[in-house]
């Protein structure tokens, strides 16, 4: 079995950039790495992603949103993540089940037990071995996210960026609470620094504190 690392953070935290940098670093050290994302990661889940992130779909109810995320995750786990882990890869995933607890649980106010039940079903009880939380101020993150959207080509995936500041503050607080509750699984990194500085902090902690001391064989 491989090793499963997830990246979490609010909009504009820089996790997508950092997951790519960690992947490159691990590959340079000889590890076999699969990088993926949620929502999405495979053809069916990418179609669900287009619904979830399209700002024109602002009328999606919280429960519909939760169920769509669960459906996308169920397909992604079955088609991509579990097969990659069985092949012995390190899987790096941009968002996973913690995002649902933060966004749909805390942000949307859906009861924790409902989110937990759907997460367990969609994940087939799979849990990350390690989660990297990149934390940053909400205003800073949203400004970064909006700049990215304005310069990106393709569909404008901005439904969550258009939410009120209070929504994003609730999501950030939920992430910090999750990290506090499971310090053995979470690495929390300050996302306010430069890209290289953040990358060095993540690589150092992943390699020195986790991979070298884990019971998982990463050969």
UniProtKB/Swiss-Prot annotation:
Question: GO molecular function, one example?
Answer: ATP binding
- Enumerate the UniProt keywords alphabetically: ATP-binding, Kinase, Nucleotide biosynthesis, Nucleotide-binding, Transferase
Q: Name the reaction it catalyses.
A: dTMP + ATP = dTDP + ADP
**Gene Ontology BP terms:** dTDP biosynthetic process; dTTP biosynthetic process; dUDP biosynthetic process
**Gene3D superfamilies the UniProt entry points to:** P-loop containing nucleotide triphosphate hydrolases
**Residues at which ATP binds:** 9-16
Q: Which GO terms describe its cellular component?
A: cytosol
Give the Enzyme Commission number.
2.7.4.9
Q: Does the entry feature the keyword Nucleus, yes or no?
A: no
What is this protein's function? Answer: Phosphorylation of dTMP to form dTDP in both de novo and salvage pathways of dTTP synthesis.
- What's this protein's family per the entry? Belongs to the thymidylate kinase family.
Which PANTHER family does the entry link to? THYMIDYLATE KINASE, UMP-CMP KINASE 2, MITOCHONDRIAL
Task: Kindly give the HAMAP family that the UniProt entry links to this protein.
Answer: Thymidylate_kinase
Q: What is this protein called?
A: Thymidylate kinase
């Amino acid at each position: 079995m491989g090793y499963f690392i997830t990246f979490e953070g609010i909009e504009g935290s820089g996790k997508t950039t950092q997951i790519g940098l960690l992947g490159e670093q691990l590959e340079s050290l000889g590890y076999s790495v699969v990088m993926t994302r949620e929502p999405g990661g495979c053809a069916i889940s990418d179609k669900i992603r287009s619904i979830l992130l399209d700002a024109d779909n602002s009328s999606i109810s919280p429960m519909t949103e939760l169920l769509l995320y669960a459906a996308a995750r169920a397909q992604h786990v079955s088609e991509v993540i579990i097969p990659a882990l069985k092949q012995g890869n390190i899987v790096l995933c941009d968002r996973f089940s913690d995002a649902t607890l933060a966004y749909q649980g805390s942000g949307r106010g859906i009861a924790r037990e409902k989110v937990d039940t759907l997460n367990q079903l969609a994940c087939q009880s799979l849990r990350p071995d390690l989660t990297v939380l990149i934390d940053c101020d909400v205003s800073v993150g949203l400004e970064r996210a909006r700049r990215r959207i304005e310069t990106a080509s393709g569909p404008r995936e901005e439904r969550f960026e258009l939410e009120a500041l209070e929504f994003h503050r609730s999501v950030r607080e939920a992430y910090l609470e999750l990290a506090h509750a499971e310090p053995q699984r979470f690495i929390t990194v300050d996302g306010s620094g430069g890209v290289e500085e953040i990358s060095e902090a993540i690589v150092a902690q992943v390699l020195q504190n986790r991979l070298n001391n884990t019971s998982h064989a990463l050969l």
